[in-house]
């Protein structure tokens, strides 16, 4: 009978000890001491129960039966990154006057992902940001906010809810991460810092071992509807396919249609002023958009694993990619495209990882909504052509160095029909040295 009592006691203590609260350990010691004082257990038996309880709990935690942390903590992931940047911008204006700007910058992003239950997940992120610019999470040292080591701004970067009713269906709503909204092989149309607001439904289905298909469809809020301002929306649909040609060769493609309801909407201060506007345009009044933007955007990416294995070179992957865009709502200066390649390691994770990337991009003035393109490529303007080269090298686990160089020009029209030697092209060169750390 006494052995049965000890066995029951041992099981009870194991359950009590499975949580994270350290107070349970003290409570068990007190209870065992009272049982010894009352003669229910001997001192040796009490010590045996305590030792076996500790060993059993350790074993069950290792097997995953119990967690040393509460469930909500175990289901939550904290992630972030810090980037230090030295940047030089060389500009040549129309009067042949050159200007050099050299600054230091920092970017900090911190995100939290939490699994609410088997179907729901939430994500929240904050980031450095100077003035609410949707295309940048950088802040500059000695910035216009005050300089002299003044405090820098932190803003809500994203906040979304994600629902997965089935393995092939996902619904996302809120201020979302861009990859949840659409797939893009380059930042020709969308700067990767943008976190769109609205809702998206996504489908992803594997058809066979070589083929999977996906589709995203969404409605995005551009300007809120108020009593004084008519709201504007954007809508998109993107069907796509992944196809494994063989073990080392794969293809990904998509055809995106995006409609931006912008005609008559007042441009914000973040507009670069390249799209055709109507009304009074000054340094504080940005006019209204003359057109809607109805974008047809095919995109393709070809990936080759170990492309140079035949000649003894260990290069993890080689990618070729490209995009084309046509604004169907207008008839001139309405196209753009990007072409590029990337080779080296897929990800920068450890010492010795390396990556080289090149992109050529061209955008006509009215080819895309001018609030969207990469903010580093000619300051995010349309009506441009640009070369970009990137070299990255891993210094340690989750630490890397990067060199990113842009050489860009303004263009007269949408096919780059301007002499690059002309000062009217207003060429600029942007050089960025980055130290990247992930945690």
Stretches found by the model and what they are:
Residues 345-349, 362-439:
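C-terminal functional modules
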Residues 68, 109-111, 159-162, 200-202, ...:
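Outer-membrane beta-barrel architecture
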Residues 51, 55-63, 67, 78-84, ...:
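Mobile, glycine-rich extracellular loop/lid and propeptide segments
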Residues 165-171, 179-347, 353, 360, ...:
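Signature for the C-terminal beta-barrel architecture of outer-membrane proteins
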Residues 5-95, 439:
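N-terminal periplasmic/intermembrane-space "pro-region" immediately following the signal or transit peptide
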Residues 77, 81-83, 103-107, 151-158, ...:
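Transmembrane beta-barrel architecture of outer-membrane proteins
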Residues 1-3:
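N-terminal secretory signal peptides that target proteins for export/translocation
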Residues 85-107, 113-167, 178-191, 283-288, ...:
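Surface-exposed loop and membrane-interface regions of Gram-negative outer-membrane beta-barrel proteins
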């Amino acid at each position: 009978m006494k052995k049965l009592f000890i066995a029951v006691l041992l099981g009870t203590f194991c359950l009590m000890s499975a949580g994270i609260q350290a107070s349970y350990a003290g409570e068990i010691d007190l209870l065992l001491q009272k049982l010894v004082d009352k003669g229910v257990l001997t001192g040796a038996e009490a010590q045996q129960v305590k030792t076996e309880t500790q060993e059993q709990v350790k074993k069950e935690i290792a097997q995953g039966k119990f967690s040393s942390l509460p469930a909500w903590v175990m289901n939550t992931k904290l992630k972030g990154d810090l980037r230090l940047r030295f940047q030089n911008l060389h500009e040549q204006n129309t009067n042949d006057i050159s200007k050099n700007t050299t600054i230091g910058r920092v970017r900090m992003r911190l995100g939290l992902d939490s699994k609410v239950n088997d179907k729901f997940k939430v994500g929240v992120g904050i980031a450095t940001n100077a003035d609410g610019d949707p295309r940048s999470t950088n802040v500059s040292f000695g910035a216009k906010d005050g300089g002299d080591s003044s405090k820098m701004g932190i803003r809500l970067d994203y906040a979304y809810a994600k629902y997965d009713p089935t393995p092939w269906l996902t619904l996302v709503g809120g201020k979302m991460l861009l990859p949840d909204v659409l797939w893009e092989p380059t930042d020709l149309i969308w700067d990767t810092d943008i976190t769109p607001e609205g809702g998206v439904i996504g489908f992803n289905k594997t058809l066979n071992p070589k083929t999977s298909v996906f589709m995203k469809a969404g409605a995005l809020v551009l300007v809120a509807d108020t009593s004084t301002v008519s709201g504007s929306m954007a809508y998109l649909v993107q069907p796509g396919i992944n196809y494994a040609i063989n073990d080392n060769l794969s293809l990904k493609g998509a055809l995106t249609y995006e409609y931006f309801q912008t005609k008559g909407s007042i441009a914000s201060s973040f507009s670069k002023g390249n799209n055709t506007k109507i009304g009074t345009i000054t340094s504080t009044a940005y006019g209204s958009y003359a057109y809607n933007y109805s974008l047809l955007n095919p995109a393709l990416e070809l990936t080759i694993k170990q492309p140079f294995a035949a000649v003894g070179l260990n290069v993890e992957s080689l990618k070729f990619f490209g995009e084309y865009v046509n604004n169907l709502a207008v008839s001139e200066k309405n196209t753009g495209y990007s072409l590029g390649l990337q080779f080296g390691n897929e990800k920068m994770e450890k010492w010795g990882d390396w990556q080289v990337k090149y992109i050529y991009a061209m955008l006509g003035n009215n080819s895309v909504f001018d609030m969207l393109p990469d903010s580093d490529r000619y300051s995010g303007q349309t009506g441009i052509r640009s070369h970009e080269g990137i070299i990255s090298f891993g210094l340690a686990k989750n630490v890397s160095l990067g060199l990113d160089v842009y050489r860009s020009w303004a263009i007269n029209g949408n096919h780059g029909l301007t002499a690059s030697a002309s000062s009217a092209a207003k060429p600029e060169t942007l050089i960025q040295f980055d130290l990247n750390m992930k945690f």
